[in-house]
Amino acid sequence: MLRHLPSRLPVKMWGRTLEKQSWRDSSQTPPPCLIRRLDHIVMTVKSIKDTTMFYSKILGMEVMTFKEDRKALCFGDQKFNLHEVGKEFEPKAAHPVPGSLDICLITEVPLEEMIQHLKACDVPIEEGPVPRTGAKGPIMSIYFRDPDRNLIEVSNYISS
């Protein structure tokens, strides 16, 4: 049987005692950021085979198999775990659908080379190169879509 805890249970964090508070309470000072980096994103896709082929051939991502027959696309210190629509693993997003992702990936390859590579692979560029703002400053970006119609932005940071 579950017992109801008092609504103002003290919590130890950051070397001090905090009172329990609702995340909706805008009068409270936000805590220091608790997140260091992104580890993985789950992509729901129509076809694992098409997705792994696209991301490995177009962006050079490594295809990894884990936990029996699950697939992931690895790059840098991150990965995309792949769920095939209708065969998702629990827990999962509330509404997992192919084509709902809009992501920005940073490359060190000059964008002009990326553009030539995409054209050679028959991947249409939807927009760009265009200036945008990245997490750490100004970037130059190109946009294209994967087989599920996810919007993929590939960018270079602009050095000042």
UniProtKB/Swiss-Prot annotation:
Highest taxon above the source species: Eukaryota
**SUPFAM superfamilies reported for this sequence:** Glyoxalase/Bleomycin resistance protein/Dihydroxybiphenyl dioxygenase
Provide the VOC domain boundaries.
Answer: 37-157
Q: Name one Pfam family in it.
A: Glyoxalase
Q: Which cysteine pairs make disulfide bonds?
A: none
InterPro entries per record: Glyas_Bleomycin-R_OHBP_Dase, Glyas_Fos-R_dOase_dom, GlyoxalaseI/FosfomycinResist, VOC
Similarity comment: family membership = Belongs to the glyoxalase I family.
**Protein's recorded name:** Glyoxalase domain-containing protein 5
